[in-house]
Swiss-Prot record:
PANTHER family: RIBOSOME MATURATION FACTOR RIMM
Source species of the chain: Shewanella piezotolerans (strain WP3 / JCM 13877)
Domain PRC barrel: from-to ranges: 96-176
GO CC annotation, single: cytoplasm
Name of the protein in question: Ribosome maturation factor RimM
Subunit details: Binds ribosomal protein uS19.
Length: 176
């Protein structure tokens, strides 16, 4: 199954909350409420994905809790602790041409404007001011680098992103 078909993980279930089957939610979406824009959810239990509906959710202090269909007791909720929450790729919003999901950038080759292959995007780090590509250098990197951190700032450093070719063109010195 390609990464395009794999479910998109948006969070995970935390510990149970109360005695009626509510669960704390850890969300990876930009806003805490963003995870509830998607329905149904997919839960990964024992390596298998299954569909589940959110019946209710609310803020509980600084935490967010939810009640899921078919989860009515504390024991049922505890059995789901640490399950990943995902959605199908088709449920994801279509982004404007100049915006990208991180999952689509991971694995892209990074080439600078002089044609030097700097490696592949291994991870993306959120720094507050801008995202940063963590690029794992090729084994035979001519500059002796194991990895590079390249700010994802379009026009200044990121010249072009071609998701079809899985390539990112950057204006970046390979010695950095």
């Amino acid at each position: 199954m390609s990464s395009k078909q794999e479910p998109v993980v948006l969070g995970k279930l935390g510990s149970s909350h109360g005695i009626k089957g509510w669960l704390k939610i850890t969300t990876y979406t930009d806003s805490v409420e963003g995870i509830f824009d998607y329905s149904p959810w997919l839960l990964k239990e024992q390596g298998e994905w299954r569909e589940v509906k959110v019946l209710q959710w609310r803020m509980q202090g600084k935490a967010v809790v939810a009640c899921l269909e078919g989860v009515e007791t504390r024991d049922q909720a505890q059995a789901l602790t640490n399950c990943e929450i995902a959605v199908t790729p088709e449920q994801m919003e279509v982004l404007p041409e100049d915006e990208f999901y991180w999952r689509d950038l991971i694995g892209c080759e990074v080439v600078n404007t002089k044609g030097y292959n700097m490696g592949k995007v291994q991870e993306i780090v959120e720094t507050g001011s801008n995202d940063v590509l963590l690029v794992k250098a090729n084994a035979k990197d001519g500059f002796g680098k194991a990895e590079r951190m390249i700010p994802f700032v379009t026009e200044q450093f990121i010249q072009k992103v071609d998701l079809t070719a899985k390539q990112i063109l950057v204006d970046w010195d390979p010695d950095f």
